[in-house]
């Protein structure tokens, strides 16, 4: 009897201990899961973003070293070289000696001291020497840049409703490029754009010499400090993250982002580099102008139908720039010690939303910095071709408000030319000295109402001239002048 009671009490104690062990294990497991979830939310989602890596002078000195090589070149090596390696009878352009185009000669002739007199340091190593010349303030350059940026902002606002040329359509097309956008991101819609109100300030411009094996005597480079702060340059977009498993668009997570530039500062490097290869030429679908032989034949046998193409052919050749000559380029980049501070606002979710997640801001900032460094941070540079600055009639314009003054001057020149030209026409209308012929053409045909190239009317008060002609393609002026109200023919010669 006593043994049965002791056995029952032992079994009961074992059952109670087993139940307690299961309850304790269950509670401990639940508590560990809760702690893990809490730690993940606190340290991963709402944790503070690590500070950006330092871009101080130490990083710049270790990754960006320049060698001032213009003083290391032997002045006795190399003599003056002509523009062509082989002499040619058709080369009438005088050769330019290399000593007149290297960096040392440029600095001497422009009274700019860019390199100190002691370029070598200890142990024969070359140190980075900036200009001993006083840095430029660049106030005038800031005004020009501010005007250019203001014009771009105004133009972008005027074209805001244009479906093809607006900045909104351009950004939307760039952000939704199917070759670069991942498949788990839905269409990106731009909701807000601010082009800012402030302007970058450039200062402390100095010239340094950079070792360049492709240039005789090195290459000159301008360093400009730039700073942009307290501006509202921003862009806001909306998109959705797509979950394509187990089937496409299984879940959609709306995301809204706003990126603003808080401050940007750095050192801008600008240098001129020659073109490595001539630009490619795409043939124009328009008919080609007459050749020189055709022009000679047309000038030798003039007809009413062939006079206008004959006179317009040299003009077309003058207006069109050469297609095979290489152009100079300007290269610009930023030193690695730049500073780009961004402000990223985020809103994730549809009903219960997460606002300003630090991890999202960190990812966006890293992507923006990577995009910027892959394009304009040394050793990568942006190369832009210099525009053609040769004066051409196709680009000639008149400032607003000066039309009347220009017209009066042109009218007076027309009247003087008419008085002087008509007095000589009676005797010389049929003959012309050989030295006054158009270059590349045959004998100059007599002028009449058909052979005039182009004319424009100038109206100043009661005077109106219909015969003022601009300079022809061959360099001569049309001498078929007449005054309204005068007799036709040779009566004006009297």
UniProtKB/Swiss-Prot annotation:
Annotated ranges, domain SMP-LTD: 134-387
Organism the protein comes from: Aspergillus oryzae (strain ATCC 42149 / RIB 40) (Yellow koji mold)
Keywords, sorted A to Z: Endoplasmic reticulum, Lipid transport, Lipid-binding, Membrane, Transmembrane, Transmembrane helix, Transport
Biased composition (Polar residues): 68-81, 88-99, 300-318, 406-415
Residue ranges with Pro residues bias: 278-290
Protein name, per record: Maintenance of mitochondrial morphology protein 1
Localization in the cell: Endoplasmic reticulum membrane
HAMAP family: Mmm1 (MF_03103)
Subunit structure: Homodimer. Component of the ER-mitochondria encounter structure (ERMES) or MDM complex, composed of mmm1, mdm10, mdm12 and mdm34. A mmm1 homodimer associates with one molecule of mdm12 on each side in a pairwise head-to-tail manner, and the SMP-LTD domains of mmm1 and mdm12 generate a continuous hydrophobic tunnel for phospholipid trafficking.
Membrane topology, Cytoplasmic segments: 47-494
First-listed, main subcellular location of the protein, grouped into a coarse class: endoplasmic reticulum
Domains: entry comment: The SMP-LTD domain is a barrel-like domain that can bind various types of glycerophospholipids in its interior and mediate their transfer between two adjacent bilayers.
Topology feature Lumenal, residues: 1-25
Any Gene Ontology biological process: phospholipid transport
Composition bias, Basic residues: 57-67
Pfam families (alphabetical): MMM1
Bilayer-spanning residue ranges: 26-46
Chain positions covered by the region annotation Disordered: 53-99, 278-330, 395-494
Top-rank taxon: Eukaryota
Classification via InterPro entries: Mmm1 (IPR027537), MMM1_dom (IPR019411), SMP_LBD (IPR031468)
Biased composition (Basic and acidic residues): 425-437
Family: Belongs to the MMM1 family.
GO terms for cellular component: endoplasmic reticulum membrane; ERMES complex
A single MF term (Gene Ontology): lipid binding
Function statement: Component of the ERMES/MDM complex, which serves as a molecular tether to connect the endoplasmic reticulum (ER) and mitochondria. Components of this complex are involved in the control of mitochondrial shape and protein biogenesis, and function in nonvesicular lipid trafficking between the ER and mitochondria. The mdm12-mmm1 subcomplex functions in the major beta-barrel assembly pathway that is responsible for biogenesis of all outer membrane beta-barrel proteins, and acts in a late step after the SAM complex.
Lipid bilayer topology: Single-pass type I membrane protein
């Amino acid at each position: 009897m006593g043994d049965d009671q002791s056995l029952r009490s032992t079994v009961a104690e074992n059952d109670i201990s087993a139940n307690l062990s299961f309850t304790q294990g269950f509670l401990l497991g639940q508590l560990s899961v809760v702690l893990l979830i809490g730690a993940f939310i606190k340290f991963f989602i709402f944790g503070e973003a690590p500070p950006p890596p330092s871009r101080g002078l130490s990083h710049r000195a270790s990754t960006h070293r320049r060698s001032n090589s213009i003083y290391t070149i032997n002045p006795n090596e190399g003599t003056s070289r002509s523009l062509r390696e082989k002499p040619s009878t058709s080369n009438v352009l005088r050769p330019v000696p290399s000593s007149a185009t290297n960096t040392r000669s440029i600095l001497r002739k422009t009274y700019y001291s860019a390199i100190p007199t002691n370029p070598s340091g200890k142990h024969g190593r070359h140190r980075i020497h900036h200009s001993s010349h006083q840095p430029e303030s660049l106030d005038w350059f800031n005004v020009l840049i501010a005007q250019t940026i203001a014009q771009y902002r105004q133009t972008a606002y005027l074209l805001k409703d244009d479906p093809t040329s607006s900045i909104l359509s351009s950004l939307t097309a760039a952000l939704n490029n199917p070759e670069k956008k991942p498949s788990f991101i839905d269409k990106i819609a731009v909701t807000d754009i601010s082009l800012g109100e402030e302007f970058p300030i450039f200062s402390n411009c100095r010239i340094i010499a950079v070792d360049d094996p492709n240039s005789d005597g090195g290459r000159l480079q301008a360093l400009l400090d730039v700073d942009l702060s307290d501006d509202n340059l921003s862009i806001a977009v909306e998109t959705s993250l797509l979950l394509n498993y187990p089937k496409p668009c299984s879940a959609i997570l709306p995301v809204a982002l706003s990126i603003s530039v808080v401050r940007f500062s750095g050192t801008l490097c600008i240098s001129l580099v020659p073109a490595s290869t001539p630009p490619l030429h795409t043939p124009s679908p328009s008919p080609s102008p007459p050749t020189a032989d055709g022009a000679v034949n047309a000038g030798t046998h003039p007809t009413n139908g062939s006079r206008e193409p004959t006179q317009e052919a040299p003009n077309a050749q003058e207006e069109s720039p050469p297609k095979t000559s290489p152009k100079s380029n300007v290269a610009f980049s930023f030193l690695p010690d730049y500073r780009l501070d961004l402000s990223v606002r985020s809103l994730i979710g549809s009903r219960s939303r997460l606002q300003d997640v630090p991890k999202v801001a960190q990812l966006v900032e890293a992507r923006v910095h990577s995009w910027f460094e892959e394009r304009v941070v040394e050793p990568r540079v942006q190369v832009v071709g210099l525009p053609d600055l040769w004066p051409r009639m196709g680009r000639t314009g008149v400032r607003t408000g000066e039309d009347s003054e220009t017209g009066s001057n042109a009218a007076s020149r027309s009247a003087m030319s008419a008085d002087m030209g008509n007095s000589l026409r009676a005797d010389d209308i049929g003959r012309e000295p050989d030295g006054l012929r158009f270059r590349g053409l045959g004998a100059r045909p007599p002028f009449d109402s058909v052979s005039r190239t182009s004319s424009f009317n100038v109206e100043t008060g009661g005077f109106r001239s219909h015969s003022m002609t601009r300079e022809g393609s061959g360099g001569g002026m049309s001498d078929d002048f007449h005054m309204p109200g005068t007799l036709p023919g040779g009566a004006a010669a009297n």
